[in-house]
Protein backbone atom coordinates (compact mmCIF):
# COMPACT_ATOMS: atom_id res chain seq x y z
CA UNK A 1 0.00 0.00 0.00
CA UNK A 2 2.84 2.39 0.82
CA UNK A 3 4.22 1.90 -2.67
CA UNK A 4 0.91 2.95 -4.19
CA UNK A 5 0.81 6.13 -2.11
CA UNK A 6 4.38 6.95 -3.12
CA UNK A 7 3.56 6.40 -6.79
CA UNK A 8 0.60 8.75 -6.54
CA UNK A 9 2.69 11.35 -4.77
CA UNK A 10 5.34 11.18 -7.47
CA UNK A 11 2.85 11.72 -10.26
CA UNK A 12 1.16 14.41 -8.19
CA UNK A 13 4.16 16.61 -7.42
CA UNK A 14 6.18 15.80 -10.54
CA UNK A 15 4.43 15.61 -13.90
CA UNK A 16 7.85 15.41 -15.54
CA UNK A 17 8.37 12.04 -13.89
CA UNK A 18 5.14 10.73 -15.41
CA UNK A 19 7.17 7.93 -16.99
CA UNK A 20 8.66 7.10 -13.60
CA UNK A 21 5.20 7.14 -12.04
CA UNK A 22 3.97 4.67 -14.66
CA UNK A 23 6.90 2.37 -13.89
CA UNK A 24 6.24 2.74 -10.18
CA UNK A 25 2.61 1.73 -10.68
CA UNK A 26 3.68 -1.31 -12.69
CA UNK A 27 6.15 -2.30 -10.00
CA UNK A 28 3.53 -1.81 -7.32
CA UNK A 29 1.08 -4.05 -9.14
CA UNK A 30 3.75 -6.70 -9.66
CA UNK A 31 4.65 -6.52 -5.98
Curated annotation (Swiss-Prot):
GO terms for biological process: killing of cells of another organism. It comes from Olindias sambaquiensis (Hydromedusa). GO terms for cellular component: extracellular region; membrane; nematocyst; other organism cell membrane. Keywords: Cytolysis, Membrane, Nematocyst, Secreted, Target cell membrane, Target membrane. Signal peptide: none annotated. Cytolysin that shows weak hemolysis and weak myonecrosis. The keyword Membrane applies. It is found in: Secreted; Nematocyst; Target cell membrane. Its main location: secreted. The keyword Electron transport does not apply. This is Cytolysin Oshem 2. Circular dichroism reveals that this peptide presents mainly random coils as its main secondary structure.
Amino acid sequence: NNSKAKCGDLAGWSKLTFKSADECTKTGQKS
